[in-house]
A protein has these predicted regions:
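Short, solvent-exposed loop/turn and secondary-structure capping segments
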Residues: 30, 54-58, 154-155, 179-181, ...
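Short, Gly/Pro- and small/polar-rich lid/capping loops
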Residues: 21-31
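Bacterial Sec-dependent N-terminal signal peptides
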Residues: 1-22
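Hydrophobic/aromatic-rich, well-ordered segments within soluble, folded domains that form packed cores
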Residues: 32-53, 183, 187-206, 398, ...
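Intrinsically disordered, low-complexity linker/terminal regions across diverse proteins
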Residues: 71, 222, 257-260, 279-283, ...
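Short secondary-structure subsegments characteristic of cysteine-rich extracellular domains
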Residues: 12, 60-82, 213-232, 503-509, ...
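Active-site-surrounding "flap" and adjacent substrate/cofactor-binding loops of secreted or lumenal enzymes
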Residues: 37-41, 46-107
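Noncatalytic, helix-rich "gating/capping" subdomain that lines the substrate-entry/channel surface
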Residues: 85-377, 381
Length: 676
């Protein structure tokens, strides 16, 4: 339900109704812990050691975490719902038919192996027949309309400085390894990945009929183009600079400043109506694309587009293509040893194409209304606690505090599922067509849906950016909203059978984390209405940056592996949100216990259970290759350091576990982060 909650001035909602109805558990299972570990030496091991020992990595996983354990259960529930649809005949065009037919197609590997790459053969021949730069530009626009990314990407989202309206936007893209560092860095692990990528690209060319010499030449063209784009692209850290990634201009100025790209054909083929303004988020890589289109030979440009078609289609073709892509992207880059079973891939495909339709079925069967009601109260409690935390900041002026309260009071809260569901009537799934062709249809449907909903339209705050079955949560700065899908509202994050100490330490911190994103180094740049607009006094802004620098420097000094440090700037927003989430949720727990005190349970005080619950949600096992990939690309710190790096900055943690100055995790109070 989409409800806008205004923070009450004095009222404090509690979860007492549930507590009064029955005795709730501690929520702590000692089997998940390693009681031989010292919490002051390695709290992560202490809180999660039993769980990690009981969940060794299987060949399918490069990382297995609490999120994945919960996802496995969700996936089984979704499989049951989807296979129920697939087992019956339904009227063509009905939602049940679309779900069932797409699942049939995804499961039919015999048919796909027989077809091999026939579903894309005509498209590849079309690319090979291109004979001019103009034809290349037309083809790149056409491929974009099919959901095949190339050179750069574009979309239509909220205008950062006029957040009530959507704005056309162009973004860097076009590099198939995703992160520029894979093309540019020369440490041994990165060089090995780059060499494997060269082989992967070459293999895709030989698998579609080229001889070895032709494939090598085409591969070199792809690497040449992608390396040029990567060199001009913004790093993951630079992309976090909100102001530095906003370059709004008129459509006419786009044509003038970037004349080397056929924009009119691009937007025409993608069904984008005429518009007046656009933001080129990262101008430098777009200028580099102009140069590439002008300087590279037509044969090189064709090789790049040809590869993009095959690479994008690989997971929807025969097993030999799927396995080739798995070996590079999942094994070489991430460390997974075995692909997911076919039914899991099929469920993921249906979710990807018909996510909200599946979500509606999921909510109806598995999400109790009582969970939403309890979440409403928890969110209110966290809002009160954040308000108190804002008031307690001695470094912040009253003027800035007032602006912060205004923003907090304007939070738009979404819990469970949307009020209105997506209309899939314009999506046609036809089992007479190949699996690949149907997946292209699904992509085109989503593209058309968002063009119709966004271009030249005001922002719809009721729109959900995640499906209800998603095990995650988010804060969106341009709508100033926090969203908690039904998928995350279950153990270990939310436990209706456990008391407040457990729930505030888990889902409470998640709620506080998302709220804090409204006040982290990025979110703090947006006002209560979602506009990129300064609301800080100069003195307060300087002090805020000084305090977040402590966080950045602390994580920069963490050694994730002997030859690999964490990236404090890339992870600054998430680390700040973890810090704020812990402080806010702990404050909310203390408020709740003033009215309804909690006793020691299973040998742990409420405060200890709070921190143990937090630690457990980050339990995971991760392969080294995946860990290296995450440090390059993920704005979140590795799970161990979301515990061992975050908790030593929380004063209450020391008291709860009697952590002394002799403990390795101890940080002197003057060196601890104190932001929210």
């Amino acid at each position: 339900m989409n409800i806008k909650y205004i923070l009450p001035a004095l009222a404090l909602a509690t979860t007492s109704a549930w507590a009064q109805q029955k005795e709730l558990s501690s929520g702590i299972d000692k089997a998940n812990m390693d009681l031989t570990a010292n919490p002051g030496v390695d709290f992560y091991q202490y809180a999660t050691g039993g769980w990690t020992a009981a969940h060794p990595l299987t060949p399918e996983y490069a990382r297995y975490a609490q999120f994945d354990a919960l996802a496995e259960n969700n996936r089984k529930q979704l499989r049951e719902l989807i296979e129920e649809m697939a087992a019956k005949q339904h009227k063509q065009g009905s939602l049940e038919q679309k779900i069932g037919s797409l699942y049939h197609l995804a499961m039919d590997s015999v048919r796909r192996n027989k077809e091999d790459y026939a579903p894309i053969k005509a498209l590849l021949e079309e690319v090979q027949a291109l004979d001019s730069r103009k034809a290349v530009q037309y083809e790149m626009a056409k491929l974009q309309s099919m959901g095949i990314p190339n050179f750069f990407s574009f979309g239509c989202d909220a205008d950062l400085k006029n957040a009530k309206w959507n704005l056309m936007q162009v973004y860097q893209g076009g590099i198939s390894m995703g992160e520029r560092d894979y093309y540019l860095e020369n440490d041994e692990p990165t060089k090995k990945i780059r060499e494997a990528y060269r082989q992967y690209v070459k293999n895709l060319f030989t698998m579609t009929g080229m001889n070895a010499e032709e494939a090598t030449q085409a591969m070199e063209a792809v690497l040449k183009i992608e390396t040029r784009i990567a060199t001009a692209s913004y790093s993951a850290t630079k992309q976090r600079d909100v102001e530095g990634n906003y370059h709004k201009m008129s459509y006419q100025k786009l044509l003038t400043d970037f004349p080397g790209i056929d924009w009119s054909t691009l937007f025409l083929l993608n069904g984008v109506p005429a518009f007046n303004e656009i933001s080129v988020s990262q101008p430098e890589p777009i200028h580099e694309v102009e140069k590439i289109l002008a300087e590279c030979s037509v044969e090189e440009l064709k090789a790049y587009l040809y590869y993009k078609v095959v690479n994008d289609a690989s997971s929807s073709l025969s097993d030999r293509f799927r396995q080739e892509a798995f070996y590079f992207y999942n094994h070489t880059m991430s460390g997974a040893e075995q692909d997911r079973p076919r039914w899991k891939r099929a469920v993921a495909a249906v979710e990807g194409a018909l996510g909200m339709a599946v979500g509606k079925l999921y909510v109806e069967k598995y999400f109790p209304e009582s969970s939403k009601q309890r979440m409403v109260e928890l969110v209110k409690n966290l809002q009160v606690a954040l308000g108190e935390r804002i008031d307690a900041q001695k470094w912040m002026s009253e003027a800035t505090k007032k602006q912060a309260h205004d923003k907090l009071n304007s939070f738009y809260v979404k819990i469970g599922y949307p009020d209105e569901w997506m209309d899939y009537s314009k999506l046609d799934i036809d089992e007479n067509l190949s699996y690949y062709e149907n997946m292209v249809r699904a992509t085109q449907f989503m593209s058309n849906y968002y063009v119709e909903k966004h271009v030249n339209k005001p922002v719809d705050r009721t729109e959900w950016l995640m499906t209800p079955q998603t095990i995650n949560a988010y804060y969106n700065p341009t709508t100033n909203e926090i969203c908690f899908p039904a998928g995350i509202l279950q153990p270990p994050f939310f436990n209706a059978e456990a008391d407040d100490a457990c729930n505030y330490g888990a889902i409470g911190v998640v709620i506080g984390h998302e709220m804090t994103h409204g006040f982290d180094d990025q979110g703090a740049q947006f006002d209560k209405d979602g506009n990129l607009k300064n609301w800080w006094t100069e003195k307060d802004k300087t002090e805020f940056e000084k305090r977040t620098k402590v966080m950045r420097d602390f994580f920069d000094n963490i050694k994730v592996l002997p030859d690999l440090h964490a990236n404090g700037q890339l992870t600054l927003g998430e680390n700040t949100a973890d810090h704020g989430g812990l402080n806010i949720a702990y404050q909310a727990l203390q408020n709740a216990m003033k009215l309804h005190p909690l006793d020691k349970k299973d040998g742990f005080t409420p405060e200890q259970r709070f921190f143990l619950s937090y630690g457990l949600i980050w339990a995971n096992n991760t392969r080294e290759a995946m860990l290296r990939q995450l440090v390059k690309t993920d704005p979140h710190s590795p799970a161990r350091w979301r515990v061992n790096g975050a908790l030593p900055h929380i004063d209450a943690w020391y008291k709860a576990f009697n952590i002394t100055s002799k403990a390795p995790l101890f940080i002197p109070k003057k060196n601890r982060v104190e932001v929210w």
